[in-house]
Amino acid sequence: MSDSDSDSDYELTLSANALAALEEFKREEQQHQEAFQKLYDETDEDFQKKKKEEGMKLFKEDWQLSQFWYSDDTAAILADAILEGADENTVIAIVSAPSVYAAIQKKPTNEIPTEHIYLFEFDKRFELLAGRDHFFFYDYNKPLDFSDEIKGKVDRLLIDPPFLNEDCQTKSSITAKCLLAPNDNSKTKKGVFKHRLISCTGERMSEVISKVYSDTRITTFLPEHSNGLSNEFRCYANFECSSWKFAS
């Protein structure tokens, strides 16, 4: 057999393997879509129960949208931090971090102090998670393109912009500043400062974060992702809590 024949056979084998992998991927996608569609057909009671139990397991990551879900522990810690000391009047926005929203929903009802918790997300699948009344379609390229009714009304905000570049971080910060109510150092009925801001993003974005959120500092908390992520992630916040302190 000539070298050219060997090369040709190798290319054919490689192509066959690639084709098989593609077909398997398509099958998995189809199965996932069918399972997802089934959720729409269930009664509201059945779905609410499943949503609480399954959380982010219902939603497959779309890497083209730079979707990387937090680990369960990380999502739970961030959920606790944003809820800590809130009362029934506290307004909370979760921006581009649906796994934190899912972690909040998993909590017992008596551990969720407010009904005013909203999800801002580009992926419209998550309207199913949050519900129509608590979901805002959000595209960071249009940072002010959402309902005026919530602008300047948010007391606490957690944001995890999808891309680790200055453009995305800066545009996302425009959204955050538009949503947040002025910080007047008022406290909730539980005696905790009402205003809180959390930004989770890559360590290499630290200079950008210090510029766009001048009142935040890097914390000791290290966010982790369920499927691993090569980029070092950090949590920036303008407050300390039971889960973290400001890093020295």
Curated annotation (Swiss-Prot):
Single biological process term from Gene Ontology: methylation
Keywords, ordered alphabetically: Cytoplasm, Methyltransferase, Transferase
Cellular component, GO annotation: cytoplasm
MF annotations from Gene Ontology: nucleic acid binding; protein-lysine N-methyltransferase activity
Pfam short name (any one): N6-adenineMlase
Matching InterPro entries: DNA_methylase_N6_adenine_CS, Efm5/EEF1AKMT1, Mlase_EEF1AKMT1/ZCCHC4
EC number: 2.1.1.-
Primary role: S-adenosyl-L-methionine-dependent protein-lysine N-methyltransferase that trimethylates elongation factor 1-alpha (TEF1 and TEF2) at 'Lys-79'. Required for replication of Brome mosaic virus (BMV).
Protein name stated in the entry: Protein-lysine N-methyltransferase EFM5
The organism of origin for this protein: Saccharomyces cerevisiae (strain ATCC 204508 / S288c) (Baker's yeast)
Phylogenetic placement of the source organism: Eukaryota, Fungi, Dikarya, Ascomycota, Saccharomycotina
The encoding gene: EFM5
